From Swiss-Prot:
One of its GO terms (molecular function) is zinc ion binding. GO terms for cellular component: nucleus. This is Zinc finger and SCAN domain-containing protein 12. It comes from Pan troglodytes (Chimpanzee). CDD domains: SCAN. There is a cross-link at K20, K25, K196 (Glycyl lysine isopeptide (Lys-Gly) (interchain with G-Cter in SUMO2)). Residues 46-128 form the SCAN box domain. Pfam families: SCAN, zf-C2H2. May be involved in transcriptional regulation. Residues 154-175, 224-264 are annotated as: Disordered. It is found in: Nucleus.
């Protein structure tokens, strides 16, 4: 009764208080406190709407009215457009389908749209080595502990029932944060255990979802409030892992033996939140706010002593230093190859598993790495942004341009560790190294040459004379499928490889490449004996026969040998078939494109 008189006395003196008391006739005190916090009220009302209980109302009409009110408070149609409301619904479903480990963390960032969620997850993958996938690599003990933390987070989320919220314990969030510290220590190891704060700062945390929800409640339910014994007995038993544990002096929160009591007191509910003046985000710790503000100011105080590159967070600098130290802590169990980043190991393991997550929308081709898809797309767009300053030739990849420039500079950066021989292109080095890796190569029993497994199969057809790929038009057979494909372009007239300089087209890419060297002046194939250089490898091989004296081509009539195979003219085709002239004509016509065939057949 005394409290009633006190309120009445203030009503005459303080008009705003009178309005507040009138409002409390229709809403709970917790509702009113939540409305004062505009930053997180939308999320609170969404949870109210989704978990509203029919039993909380006196009848169906009141229930429907209450649902409409909560939906209106959540979606705010008076201030949001239809597109914005749809985005809120899509955002809600997007957060729902995320894995539990990522879902809880993303919700702490309070994203405003689906694009912000994507940005947060991509930044997490890029900066923190895909921690969602690190979870799957934990030991059994770590996995069980992480699952327990997720379960505690779920149980720590406040019920959306208006009645049950009053009885919701106010000390679950700090315990969850203590549990999360232990999980982080398990993940990163003792060496990086002290960097928990920097790791969380790099992720720009805002505190977990339940703690944000609790901070919006009235101060009457915070640490200093005196609670009845029956409220404590209603605490879920799952939130207390042991009967006797150290507790917080302020609110009785149970702490594990390894949790930091000082850290808990600093984040205990009742402490002020720190808001960013630029974007409005709030943080439970001032250090988190300072770290976040560097995004707006561009400040990067952590600088690498080796290369001078600067970073916003200390943990990113530590990971960067691995580049200079050469440390590769992540090792593949299949082949033993080591990597400096977890994400690099994860991408590499897809080579063993055959996983290809990235698909091209134009042709359907799949890739195990995003970079592979990115470079592949340039084939369809014909984008070649990297241009050589010496010959103005353009390339789709920077790495290919770098290799090409070695033709002008004479640089051969790819050196064989076995014999020291250097090459301009990495592909040339890989082909060369097969010579040394005898244990991984397959040797031809006929001539002793070594090949890869597929290369040996094709090579053996030279000795057996097998030519399984046959042309349907002229019945000419080939050892390789690629040779048949190139040959068929003679009949179809297709010349897909066109020179950008003069417009001349060719049936083979290799012929186009060799032709383009006429314009650029490149002669990458050099003779070791006399120093003469050539545009094509075949020209170099033919030239080298001058020094070796080799003459592999022999005449069937007289037995005379030659260094080069003479090209057969159309006249010789007819002369060779003089006994059957029609057969010679048919063979000659079959080598022409269809348009020419029809023209010549009319004259015959």
């Amino acid at each position: 009764m005394a409290s009633t008189w006190a309120i009445q006395a203030h009503m005459d003196q303080d008009e705003p208080l009178e309005v507040k008391i009138e409002e409390e006739k229709y809403t709970t005190r917790q509702d009113w406190d939540l409305r004062k916090n505009n930053t997180h009220s939308r999320e609170v009302f969404r949870q109210y709407f989704r978990q509203f209980c029919y039993q909380e109302t006196s009848g169906p009409r009141e229930a429907l009215s209450r649902l409409r009110e909560l939906c209106h408070q959540w979606l705010r149609p008076e201030t949001h457009t239809k597109e914005q409301i749809l985005e809120l619904l899509v955002l809600e479903q997007f957060l729902t389908i995320l894995p539990e480990e990522l879902q809880a963390w993303v919700q702490e960032q309070h994203p405003e749209s689906g694009e912000e969620v994507v940005t947060v997850l991509e930044d997490l993958e890029r900066e923190l080595d895909e921690p969602g996938e690190q979870v799957s690599a934990h030991t059994g003990e770590q996995e069980m502990f992480l699952q327990e933390t997720v379960r505690l987070r779920k149980e720590g989320e406040p019920s959306m029932s208006l009645q049950s919220m009053k009885a919701q314990p106010k000390y679950e969030s700090p315990e969850l944060e203590s549990q999360q510290e232990q999980v982080l220590d398990v993940e990163t190891g003792n060496e990086y255990g002290n960097l928990k704060q920097e790791v969380s700062e790099e992720m720009e945390p805002h505190g977990n979802t339940s703690s944000k929800f609790e901070n919006d409640m009235s101060k009457x339910a915070r640490c200093g409030e005196t609670r009845e014994p029956e409220e404590i007995t209603e605490e879920p038993s799952a939130c207390s892992r042991e009967d006797k544990q150290p507790t917080c002096d302020e609110n009785g929160v149970s702490l594990t033996e390894n949790s930091d009591h000082t850290e808990h007191q600093r984040i205990c509910p009742g402490e002020e939140s720190y808001g960013c003046d630029d974007c409005g985000k709030t943080f439970s710790q001032h250090s988190h706010l300072i770290e976040h503000q560097r995004i707006h100011t561009g400040d990067r105080p952590y600088r690498c002593e080796e290369c001078g590159k600067a970073f916003r967070g200390r943990t990113v600098l530590i990971r960067h230093k691995i580049i200079h130290t050469g440390e590769k802590p992540y090792k593949c169990n299949e082949c033993g190859k080591a990597f400096g980043r977890w994400s690099a190991l994860n991408q590499h393991q897809r080579l063993h598993t055959g996983e290809k997550h990235y698909h091209c929308n134009d042709c359907g081709k799949a890739f195990s790495q995003k970079a592979g898809l990115f470079h592949h797309i340039k084939i369809h767009t014909r984008d070649k942004p990297y241009q050589c300053t010496h010959c103005n030739k353009s390339f789709s990849r920077r790495s290919i341009l770098t290799q090409h420039q070695g033709v002008h500079t004479g640089a051969k950066p790819y050196e064989c560790n076995e014999c020291g021989k250097a090459f301009v292109y990495n592909s040339s080095l890989v082909s060369h190294q097969e010579i040394h890796h005898k244990e991984k190569c397959y040797q031809c029993k006929e001539c002793g040459k070594s090949f890869s497994q597929s290369g040996l199969i094709q090579h053996q057809r030279i000795h057996t004379g097998e030519k399984p790929y046959k042309c349907d038009v002229c019945e000419k057979a080939f050892i390789q499928r690629t040779s048949l494909t190139e040959h068929q372009r003679i009949h179809t007239g297709e010349r897909p490889y066109k020179c950008d300089k003069c417009g001349k087209a060719f049936t083979q890419r290799s012929v186009l490449t060799e032709h383009q060297r006429i314009h650029t002046g490149e002669r990458p194939y050099k003779c070791d004996e006399c120093g003469n250089a050539f545009r094509g490898i075949t020209s170099l091989i033919q030239h080298q026969r001058i020094h070796t004296g080799e003459k592999p081509y022999q005449c069937d009539e007289c037995g005379k040998a030659f260094r080069q195979r003479k090209k057969t003219s159309y006249k010789e085709i007819l002369l060779k078939n003089h006994s059957e002239p029609q057969a010679g004509v048919n063979l000659l016509l079959s080598s022409l494109i269809p348009e020419w065939q029809s023209c010549f057949r009319k004259d015959l």
